[in-house]
Structure formats: C-alpha cells, structure tokens
Amino acid sequence: MNSLAVQLHQLFNAQKRFTFPFEANKNEIPTNGIYIIFEKGETFNGCDRIIRVGTHTGDNQLYSRLKQHFVKENKNRSIFRKNIGRSLLRKDDPHHPYAEKWEYDTTSREGKQKYAHLLDVNFEKALEKRISEYIQQNLSFVVFEVKTKDDRLFWESRIISTLSNAAKAGEIKPSENWLGSYSPNEKIRESGLWLVNELYKQSLNDEEFEKLKNLVKGK
C-alpha cells in the first residue's frame, strides 16, 4: 500500500487545478479553506510535488490570501513572497548586498520610521515584479473548503507534517534545480517546502486521511 505522503499527492493531484490569472474562477474558490500549491519541475512518485500548504485565520479570507501571494506585490504581507525573494537574491549572489535590507518590515509606523529611508524602492519594486512573474508562471494550486478556523489549522498542520516528515525520512526530495534550495532558511531547504512552521509535527494517521479525503471531495 502506498504511503500517506503518496496518497496525499494522488488526492490533491486529482482535484481541479487553478493557475494565474484566477479571478474568473473566484466563484469556484471557497470563502474559507486550505490551499495546496504545486511548482513546475517538481515531481514526486509520478505526481506534481506539493511545495506549500496554507490557509487563513480570519473568516472568508481564502481568496484574499491567494491574491496576497500571487498578485499583490508586498512581501511584508506574504511570507511566501518574502521567502521566494530571499532565494532569488541568493541565487543571483550568495552574498547579495541587498539581502539584509530585504528583511526589513515597514508595515508598522515604527518599521517605516526605522527602515524606510534605508530601502532602495526601485530595487524592491523590480524584485517584487520578479517574484510575481515567478509565482504566476510556475505555480498552480488546488483548494478545498474547511469552514472553521480550528479545523483549518488542524488539517493544515497535519498535511504539512505528513509531507515534511516524509522529506526528513528521505521519501520526498526536491529537484536539483528547485529555487528553494537557495533559501537561507535550512527548514525550507531540508523540507522541500516553502514553509517554516508546522514542520515535523504529528503526521496524519489512516483514519484522519479518510476524513480528509471526504472533506476534499466535499462529502
């Protein structure tokens, strides 16, 4: 029998896939749920390999969260975008002179006062554009409805842990050319996931996977 990591990939590879632009498909994206992202060139056991799992905490925010990742050019609102930017910088130059400034967060008033004058706005805009192009050209996703915050966080954690534990055991491996291999974050490099939270916790068991299957299929 296939491992749960394989079964997870088979389950999500069989669902309706969305790519950018997805505005026309807004009515097919549940208001509350979990997204599963795939990346071109990444495969596992004959399937497209899952490279990120995510959700939202506020009510009715799934579509908005996807837009923050795919469209809105502001890495301070999307750690996913920030991590892709980190990898692009280090792919360009392992000791990129702008890498430290890319970490600055100017979302708060304090952050603006402390860091805004240090930033190269044109460089950041150009990098944000590169991030958007990378995401829009290379990533696709599936979604499934999970109505409550607690359930979303539970299933997100179980799925991430199942995948990362399989990576830790050597079952899942990123391709040699995976952009995440340039990440300064060891967790991203080792897990093969654009994630640093919920890694290596409790994996799904068989009973939970059956429940998840029904949830994904809308039963």
What do the predicted segments below correspond to?
Residues 1-130, 134-219:
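GIY-YIG nuclease catalytic motif and its immediate N-terminal context
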